[in-house]
């Protein structure tokens, strides 16, 4: 089996193993946006919140989409993934055609003037973060898998099935993991 930590890099999905029971990360799918010797940053893709972006963030009145829980770190910060790095200054390309961050005032203006559509952005409250060596230790414990990411996965609203589909896409023994009950004792 491949050492999955070795292939982890920005643009990869981080999939919680079935053994990871931490309520912050149980059956989560994260997009890794930064991964280096200092640590890692990612955003949980399958945890929409009950709040709409337009209700929670000023300046984004046109976004009638759910705000997402990006992770348990700095939950007073807002982050955005989008497909419009061509018009947003300071955006960092994570995978081809998918960007992280950029000038929020410019983003607000472009959304409110119709240049950017709500379907091209996803907002996150907080992020998932690991210090140097922390994520590697979690991989050694068997807490995580990796998979390739796509823009479609980031912008899907099929939250309930995202984890099982992403794990199943790895094939082989992962198909069994993807089909395992959330509470094995209830099997």
From Swiss-Prot:
SUPFAM superfamilies: VC0467-like. GO terms for cellular component: cytosol. InterPro entries: AlgH-like (IPR003774). It comes from the Bacteria. PANTHER family: UNCHARACTERIZED PROTEIN YQGE, UPF0301 PROTEIN YQGE. Belongs to the UPF0301 (AlgH) family. This is UPF0301 protein CT0663.
């Amino acid at each position: 089996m491949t050492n999955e930590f070795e292939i982890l890099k920005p643009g990869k999905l981080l999939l919680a193993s079935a053994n990871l029971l931490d309520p912050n990360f149980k059956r989560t799918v994260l997009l890794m946006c930064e991964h280096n010797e200092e640590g890692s940053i990612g955003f949980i893709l399958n945890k929409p919140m009950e709040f709409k972006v337009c209700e929670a963030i000023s300046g984004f009145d046109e976004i009638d989409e759910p705000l997402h829980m990006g992770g348990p770190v700095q939950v007073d910060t807002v982050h955005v993934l989008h497909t419009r790095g061509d018009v947003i200054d300071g955006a960092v390309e994570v995978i081809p055609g998918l960007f992280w961050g950029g000038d929020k005032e410019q983003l607000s203006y472009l959304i409110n003037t119709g240049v950017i559509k709500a379907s091209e952005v996803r907002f996150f409250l907080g992020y998932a973060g690991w210090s140097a060596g922390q994520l590697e230790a979690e991989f050694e414990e068997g807490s995580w898998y990796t998979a390739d990411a796509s823009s479609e996965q980031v912008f899907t609203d099929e939250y309930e099935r995202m984890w099982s589909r992403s794990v199943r896409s790895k094939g082989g023994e992962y198909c069994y993991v993807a089909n395992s009950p959330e509470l094995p004792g209830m099997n």
